[in-house]
Amino acid sequence: MGTKKPFRIKKTSDFQRVFAKHKSFANRYFVVYSDTQPKEVDVSHWRIGLSVSKKIGKAHERVWVKRRISESFNNISLFIPNNLDIVIVARPLVKGQKQKIIQDQLMHVLDLAGILNGKEKN
């Protein structure tokens, strides 16, 4: 099951705000950007934005990757602190990988960023 609407970042301005902080962590499969939510955002939970470029492949391949990332994120969402906006950028290597590898690599990059343990790195 995918990420529900209140848990998604949809506005371009929200994506740009997270990218502007220049807090990024990466591995071979993903680049993760994170930022605390601004006061205007009236949610008390994390939000996720996914970016899957045309370098990944055709539309059906990009949707496949988005679904796998979303499912993996939902499986580990209990470990994500509230009031955090996270943007995940998929790299081309993620295409065609098994769900287990995608989830493990997503956990790895979120751990590098200090997001999983609730101590976000600067």
UniProtKB/Swiss-Prot annotation:
Offer a single GO CC term for the protein: ribonuclease P complex
Q: Sorted alphabetically, which keywords does the UniProt record give? A: Endonuclease, Hydrolase, Nuclease, RNA-binding, tRNA processing
Which InterPro entries is this protein grouped with? Answer: Ribosomal_Su5_D2-typ_SF (IPR020568), Ribsml_uS5_D2-typ_fold_subgr (IPR014721), RNase_P (IPR000100)
One short Pfam name that applies is Ribonuclease_P
Highest taxon, organism lineage? Bacteria
Q: Name one GO molecular function term.
A: 3'-tRNA processing endoribonuclease activity
Record-linked Gene3D superfamilies: 3.30.230.10
SUPFAM superfamilies recorded for this chain? Ribosomal protein S5 domain 2-like
Enzyme class, UniProt record, top EC level: hydrolase
What the entry lists under HAMAP family is as follows:
RNase_P
Quaternary structure annotation from Swiss-Prot or TrEMBL? Consists of a catalytic RNA component (M1 or rnpB) and a protein subunit.
The family annotation for this protein states: Belongs to the RnpA family.
State the protein's name: Ribonuclease P protein component
**What organism does the UniProt record list as the source?**
Oenococcus oeni (strain ATCC BAA-331 / PSU-1)
Q: Give the gene that encodes this protein.
A: rnpA
